Structure formats: structure tokens, C-alpha cells
Amino acid sequence: MTWPFENDTSAITKKLAKRNLKADKSRNILIIITIALATCLIMTTTLYFFASQRKSLNDAAGRYQAIINEVDNDTITKLVNDSRVQVGVSHLLGLVSYGDYKLTVRSMDETLMKLAKYPDLEGELPKSTNEIAITKAFLDRAGLSKSVGDIISLNLGDGEKDYTLCGILPVENSNYSVFVSQSYIENKISEPAYSAYIRLNESDGWSKAAIQAELSTLCRELKIQPEQMQFSTYYFSLIEQRSSQYITVIAFISLIIALACTLVIYSLFYVS
């Protein structure tokens, strides 16, 4: 009942109530959106870091772990026959000038192709002294339109000669290399020294310390000097990206997101 001298405020009260309900509803929707976005950000960050770790481990799988330099034929034979390791062999013959850049001349075997994770070779590696394989980067830089089986004239340090192009390695990024056969190396050098690219068998999941200790033991057994062996910094940088490091980063980022989310919700409750 409303007395004659009283104002009827029921309509205003209803309007205020409706406005408050609408404001509460909007605020609740904003809170839900804020929490959902924060959850999505945390999940996206987590998935990104774990995907990065998986990519690194996949990239490391099968790669060579160390290089042993200045190795003679006898030691190469011992390494190749050792069941503990995979061994890729290469000999760097030298660098030759081609125009305004240098061309690397070296040998390489099939095992090294796998351990270095080179892309699939178009054709095959050279077997005879008159066969060579070349990187695509060199052909592109030199402006040579050549295919496997073509004859190519090059000066590899002993005058310009014709060679059969037996393989093209599809790598770019200024990798100007020519690969010659083992017989070519032996014709040029009586006692060539090789580089052995080695990897321990079944070592996926091993720690850096365990791998390096085992490889050092192998070298001692074969009387290889410590200074001859060089560990692959690229390989070990890949496997050292452990889950604990990622979890720490994820936890830190999640904390920042959670704090930001809390501030947004606080402002919605107390500022609006």
C-alpha cells in the first residue's frame, strides 16, 4: 500500500534489479571468457613446448655424436668392425676455387649420409675415379643445368677434366661441395687420413655424460688420442633440451597467465 504522501519507487527498484541482473550476467560471461582464454593459453604453451622437445629429440635420433679426426685405414677398419658403433667415413681433399667462391672436395660413404641426415641423394655416390656427386647449391650458383648421367668439366686441383655426374645432393644454403670416390682419394694420396663420424648403437635416451664416457672409453681401447675426438655440439644441444627445463618454463608462463587472469576477475568484481 502506498500512502498519498509517499512516492511509488517499485518501478525504479525493478529497473535497478534488472540492470544489476544484466550486469551480473555480463560479468559472469566475461569471467568465463577470461578463464577459458587463460586455459587455452596455458594449454597452447604446454603443447608448443612439448612439440618443440619432441622435434628436437626426433632430429637428434640417428645423428652422429662425435668426429674422430686424422684416422688411418687400420683404425677405420677397427671402428667399422666394432659392434658398439655406427661409423661414417670421409676424407677432406681440400678446397678449390670456382669463380668467386670455394668448392669443397671430399669423399663420403652411405653411412655418413645417414648419420649426417642428408636428404636423399638423386642418383648414387661415386665409385670410380671419373665419377663425382655434386650439391644442388653448387649447380645453382654456377648456373649449370646438369642431370644425373651428364658429363661435367671441373678442375678439382689437378687441371680441368671431364667427370660423369653420378649424383646430386639436394642441399642448398651455400653448401658448395663435390664428392669423389674412395679410389680417387687413394690415387691422390698414398696414406690418406680420414674423419670418422661415430654414433653409439642403441643410445637413444642416454644422457650426455653417459654417451661421452662410452665414446671416450672406445677411443682409449683403440689408442685414439683424446684430442682427435670432437663431440658434436649440435647433437648434444638437441638432447639436452629435457622435460624438466620445459616444465619450468611452462610453470612460469602459466603463473603469469594465472596472475593476469586473477587481476581481470578482481577488476570485474570490485571495479564494475
Regions of interest found by a model, annotated:
Residues M1-C40:
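N-terminal Sec/SRP start-transfer signal
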Residues Q230-I247:
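Short, aromatic-rich amphipathic segments at membrane interfaces
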Residues D8-L16, L47, E160, A210, ...:
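Charged, alpha-helix-enriched surfaces in structured cytosolic catalytic cores
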Residues F50-Y234:
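Basic-flanked hydrophobic alpha-helices used for secretion and membrane insertion
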Residues P4-N7, T45, F236:
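Juxtamembrane/interface segments of multi-pass membrane proteins
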